[in-house]
Amino acid sequence: MRISLILVFIGPPGSGKGTQASLLSEKFSIISVGKVLRTVMESNTAEADVVKKFIKSGKLVPSNITNKIVVNALKNIDQCKSIILDGYPRDIFQADFLQENLQMDFKVLFFDIDDAVVLRRLSGRISCTDCGTIYNKLYCMPKINGVCDICNSSSFQNRVDDDESIIKLRLESYKKETLPLLEFYKAQDKLTLIDANQSTENILKKIKKISGIY
């Protein structure tokens, strides 16, 4: 691989990982596991039924499916750019798998945020039906009302996993499965904490400084 830098974004749903990845996409290739899983969910495959069942119940999708998605994405991505892994790994098993298959160093950024902020953000979230770009009815709508900034589509939808009851289940699952990664990566001196309660602009400045490529 010719990749110069890999940033791993981990944190609860709604912590702003996807927003920051989009803002950095000029210099980074983005692998958004959540976005890929939603694409799989909308496909006409047996795998789609499995993914849909887990996402609708607020649980993590099984690692055998998620790991396969990441490996395929790494094979097909533009390796002349640096990479952001958005939302992966989500548990210790996936973290071990990533280190075995990546075979190069990376930095882990943990987006730390209050549960109340997550609930407020996700309950107002919508996405473009055509390209999947995420907006928020409370603070981040398209520049032209009703028209996606990226693909000019006028079709938007509420995501199935952004229902309040499902959000709470996702947070519980995250705390159980993903929080142990903090100690895992802290012990390897890979971990940097990001206060995701801050403004988008302040978070972006910190990530740019950490990356060292701006």
From Swiss-Prot:
Subcellular compartments: Cytoplasm
Top EC class, one word: transferase
Cellular component terms per the entry's GO annotation: cytoplasm
Pfam hit, one: ADK_lid
Alphabetical list of InterPro entries matching this protein: Adenyl_kin_sub (IPR006259), Adenylat/UMP-CMP_kin (IPR000850), Adenylat_kinase_CS (IPR033690), Adenylate_kinase_lid-dom (IPR007862), ADK_active_lid_dom_sf (IPR036193), P-loop_NTPase (IPR027417)
HAMAP family for the chain: Adenylate_kinase_Adk
Protein name: Adenylate kinase
Species annotation: Orientia tsutsugamushi (strain Ikeda) (Rickettsia tsutsugamushi)
Name of the encoding gene: adk
